[in-house]
Amino acid sequence: LVALLHDAGARLIVADVDKERAATCARNYDAKLVSAEEIYEVAADIFAPCALGAILNDQTIPRLNVEIVAGAANNQLSAERHALDLEARGILYAPDFILNAGGIICGGAYLLNETQHQLEQRITKIYDTLLEVFDLAKRCRITSATAAERYAESRLPIAMSVR
């Protein structure tokens, strides 16, 4: 993610519990380095948790100074109610299992013997899916996390029929 954002011209601030890895990343991508504890207070557009789960919790959410949480880490919310906490603070939450669906899509494409082009087409649809989830959340006045769960549940019959 850091490489993609760097190549797109984003200004980056990085942190990791592995201080050496964080320093290498900061050096390689001309990013500002902060500690894993400081990252929550950093004023930024996007907070992208990409490693540890359950990092969005009662202690960290009040410290966030961002507009969007969108990262690839699994199970970012410590509890379902934390989606409400993010919403109450005006922070848009991109549900992790929608954003990081590329891995499972890749596995499915492999099992179905799909081409690289077919795989890339599926992966680019993640963006559209995310927009659908945000729209569902807005229309139904629910959190994006709940909307993502409803969306996934609505897709299960289709997925099961592919077997």
Predicted ranges, named:
Residues 36-42, 53-69, 81:
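Rossmann-fold NAD(P) dinucleotide-binding segment
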Residues 67-163:
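Adenosine-phosphate binding glycine-rich loop
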Residues 3, 53, 60-62, 83, ...:
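Short glycine/threonine-rich loop-to-helix capping motif typified by GTGT followed
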Residues 22, 27-31, 50, 85-86, ...:
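Short low-complexity, flexible loop/linker segments enriched in glycine and/or proline
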Residues 48-51, 72:
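Short, well-ordered coil/turn residues at beta-beta hairpins
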Residues 1, 21-22, 57, 82, ...:
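Residues within well-ordered alpha-helices
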Residues 8, 29, 64-65, 89:
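Short, structured coil segments at secondary-structure junctions
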Residues 1-46:
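Glycine-rich phosphate/diphosphate-binding loop of Rossmann-like nucleotide-binding domains
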